[in-house]
């Protein structure tokens, strides 16, 4: 039964990513890693935000009510997003059997941002915040974190890299 739940979760998250013009790169345990590219970086950032909101709605309105019917505990997701250059890498020479991965500072930062999120929370890095539409920016609040909890800095200035919380 647990395998069916995890499989259903992964399938729903992958569908949501695809519906928002993203790509589901891989599934790691109960985590889904997706990425968004577009002709316009602004559009890609907004699509990623919409996808994150949709994923939480899927959990709250789709998956968890079904789990509740069978007396299973609810599942919660934590979303972390960042923006920047990454590199897509293929491990192996056989196109059918090789593994594809995405590497780079933005992927690393997205994982760190996600690690700071609470269940059913969307957190984004400053580089995403700068790219999203001003109307969407109004739904985010800069998160105050102690340097003991959040140590990540801009490489060029050394200033603390801000993260923002979705509040609306």
Language-model features, listed with the residues they occupy:
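Serine endopeptidase catalytic core focused on the charge-relay Asp
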Residues: 55
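Helical (often loop-to-helix) elements that flank the catalytic cores of nucleotide-handling enzymes
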Residues: 44-50
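Intrinsically disordered, glycine/charged-rich C-terminal tails and inter-domain linkers
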Residues: 119-168
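Catalytic/regulatory signature loops of cyclic-dinucleotide turnover enzymes
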Residues: 82, 105-130
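Conserved long alpha-helical elements within nucleotide-processing catalytic cores of c-di-GMP signaling
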Residues: 1-11, 26
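Amphipathic alpha-helical transducer elements in NTP-driven molecular machines
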Residues: 10, 52, 104-110
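Short alpha-helical functional segments enriched in proximate histidine and acidic residues
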Residues: 16, 58
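Catalytic core of nucleotidyl cyclases, primarily class III adenylyl/guanylyl cyclases
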Residues: 20-44, 64-103
């Amino acid at each position: 039964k647990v395998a069916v739940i995890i499989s259903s979760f992964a399938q729903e998250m992958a569908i949501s990513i695809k519906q928002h013009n993203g790509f589901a790169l891989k599934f790691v345990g109960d985590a889904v890693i997706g990425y968004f590219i577009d002709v316009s970086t602004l559009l890609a950032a907004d699509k990623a935000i919409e996808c994150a909101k949709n994923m939480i709605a899927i959990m709250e309105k789709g998956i968890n009510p079904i789990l509740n019917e069978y007396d299973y505990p609810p599942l919660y997701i934590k979303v972390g997003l960042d923006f920047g250059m990454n590199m897509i890498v293929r491990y192996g020479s056989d196109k059918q059997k090789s593994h594809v991965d995405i590497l780079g500072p933005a992927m690393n930062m997205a994982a760190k941002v996600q690690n700071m999120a609470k269940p059913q929370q969307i957190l984004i890095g400053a580089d995403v915040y700068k790219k999203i539409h001003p109307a969407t920016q109004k739904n985010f609040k800069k998160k105050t974190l102690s340097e003991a909890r959040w140590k990540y800095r801009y490489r060029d200035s050394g200033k603390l890299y801000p993260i923002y919380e979705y509040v609306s």
